[in-house]
Swiss-Prot record:
It comes from Methanocaldococcus jannaschii (strain ATCC 43067 / DSM 2661 / JAL-1 / JCM 10045 / NBRC 100440). This is Uncharacterized protein MJ0054. The lineage of its organism: Archaea, Methanobacteriati, Methanobacteriota, Methanomada group, Methanococci. NCBIfam families: methan_mark_8. Pfam families: DUF2099. It comes from the Archaea. InterPro entries: Methan_mark_8.
Length: 281
């Protein structure tokens, strides 16, 4: 039996076994502007979450052997995967260390693989290896950290990327401790870009701006309120992504080059509109 656990829309915990949704916990977030705009979900409930996950399973094979692993289209203008996709295409980074359902931690320099695996998922907590998906990932130029267990270990993923002789390495992390550990691998030759994702509910810390290069604000109250004066650049106003370092700012600007209708302005950051997730936590 394969088993997958994902923190999905609303910060609800979803368990999928053998392609079937078997558990959905009560969502902590009731409204997400992205899902309202793109999927017409005005209120996040256990039922709407289950329907959305079942749609993803049917649409692109989420958590199953039918998983589509590559995608060249942008899902949203500036999601985490889109930003990494542009950075890889423009050689601002050499490789990305990401997490995928059915495979765990992945190391890849293929921008379409990053988009395919990460563009339409939420926070993967646990996953089981599915051989057919792993084979597709490897054929597309991905290195699976642990094919037997589908282990999720971003620190070990960065170490593997270094072993493979990559120098500018982006890594997605979901907590401050992982960001610290990955940053500890930097030296004069190795540059690590830590990209904080799925950070709803993160606790406030002065170290956030020290160890994260980029953060997606998700439905985080802390990131919207406690980073004033520390944000070097911002993209988006509803669910913004903040650059907290010069390296992060460089990566955001690389993404901006791939977009039209771009406004560049000097502001006191963050700049937020009224259409925020509800509630912020």
């Amino acid at each position: 039996m394969d088993r997958h656990v994902m923190e999905a829309l609303g910060k609800a915990r979803v368990v999928v076994e053998n392609g079937r949704v078997v558990e959905v916990t009560e969502p902590k977030i009731k409204y997400c502007p992205l899902f309202a705009k793109h999927r017409g979900i005005k209120e996040i409930t256990k039922e709407s979450i289950k329907e959305n996950i079942e749609f993803r399973i049917k649409d692109f094979g989420l958590f199953t052997k039918n998983r589509v692993v590559e995608e060249s289209r942008y899902i949203v203008p500036f999601g985490a995967s889109e930003i990494l996709m542009s950075a890889l295409k423009r050689k601002a980074i050499d490789v990305a260390v990401i997490v995928a359902d059915c495979a765990g931690t992945i190391i890849t320099s293929n921008p379409n693989l990053v988009q395919g695996l990460c563009g339409r998922i939420s926070g993967i907590i646990e996953t089981s290896p599915i051989l057919e998906v792993i084979e597709k990932i490897e054929k597309a130029g991905g290195v699976v950290l642990n094919k037997k267990t589908a282990e999720i270990n971003q620190f070990e993923g960065v170490k593997k990327a270094i072993e493979l002789d990559y120098k500018k390495i982006a890594v997605t992390v979901t907590n401050l401790e992982d960001a610290k550990r990955c940053k500890s691998l930097e030296n004069d030759e190795i540059k690590i870009l830590t990209f904080g994702v799925h950070l709803t509910g993160i606790e406030g810390s002065e170290e956030i701006a020290k160890y994260f290069d980029l953060v997606t604000a998700c439905a985080s109250k802390v990131l919207r309120e406690k980073l004033k004066g520390k944000i070097k650049a911002q993209i988006g106003k509803t669910i913004p992504i903040f650059a907290l370092s010069d390296f992060g700012k460089e990566i955001l600007l690389e993404r901006a080059k791939d977009l039209d209708k771009v406004l560049i302005s000097i502001e006191n950051l963050p700049v937020l509109n009224d259409n925020q997730p509800k509630p912020l936590i």
